[in-house]
Amino acid sequence: MPTHRHRHDIVVVGARAAGAATAQLLARLGYDVVLVDRAVFPADTVSTHQIARTGVVQLHRWGLLEAVLDSGAPAIRQVTFTVEGQSTTRAVKDKAGVDLLVAPRRYILDTLVAETAAAAGADLRLGVTITGVHLNDAGRATGVYGHDAAGAPVEIDARFVLGADGLRSRVARAVGAEIIEDRGDRGATQYAYYAGIPWDGIELIIADRALTGVFPTHDNQACIWICSPSTDARAARRRAASREDAFTASLDRAAPELARRLRAGRRTSPVTGMLRSPNVIRRAHGPGWALVGDAGCHRDPITGHGLSDAYRDAELLAVALDEALRGAAEEGSALAGYQQQRDEAVRDIFDLTCALADYPPAAEFVDLQKRLSAAIDAEAATLAAASVPDRREPAPA
């Protein structure tokens, strides 16, 4: 027998960055929210997990930043840029109410935000795989179906279905959310974790056809990553005996001084990542459904803004759904407003991402990085000035 046939306000498919953040905001607003994920937390995912200032602002506004720091993620207070062998170190300035950056491991961060959603009242169901979306005769999403970890069928009815299930979103496919912009998948990102070496802060190393970085994280380790054209990464794989050998060879070429330092420490994880990173924007809403996070917009990790995008868009969507559910705005108008706000917010950084993923000469790359920093600071200021959605009385039926 199918279970869970009570009609909820919202079911959120995907309990990581975008989904958990959206669910915790909607639960704070008093809605009956079900949050599901096929993983059982704590569980890791592919991510280099540095949170840009915009995302740190969101965590601070929602009251979660201290919990992230208390989890053992180090407060990052300086960034070192290296271009053509010349290094410059800059302090993280106090802007938009925050004076630090952070790069928590995803199995810790995602668990923390999902548990915050549950504490706010969301019904968190882990180990549940959603395989499809129920649509009525008019084409409106009315719920989702799938199975639990034991294979038992699960059906969840809801007034709204939110797809926060990542780049290869099943929700997006099920509702036919079309891609409205596709800028290709020419970039690759690979990373591994290293320990036994002191880390002073974030490091960004610009080289010919590569950007390499260091993100200090939990347990005195750092995420060491390299972004490069997909063609280069694939060629390195073909030349090497293993993924790890290819990664080491790429570091030797793009960041030799960092590679030398890494030999004094130890690698604590396999090398992982993506050899193709799509730059796509999907339609973000339709009758009874909406997409958030990578399900709606994904771009090359070279700008390190994916988590920040997810947290920004989670709030935009929560506000729009609140307006629709309490009748303050017509549903189509509210969700169209969400998509417009998302598209406007992502535009500059999306374009800069695509430009950086072309790996122009160093001087142009540095100029693009400066423009990226200005865009992030402007967005952070806008977010810091906004009111946090929070209304705990029951939502109207």
Locations of the language-model features?
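Glycine-rich FAD pyrophosphate-binding loop
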Residues: V13, A27-S47
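Short beta-strand to alpha-helix junction loop
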Residues: K95-E115, A192, R237-A241
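Beta1/beta-strand and adjacent pyrophosphate-binding region of the FAD-binding site
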Residues: P2-A18
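FAD/FMN-dependent oxidoreductases across multiple families
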Residues: R238-A320, A324-G332
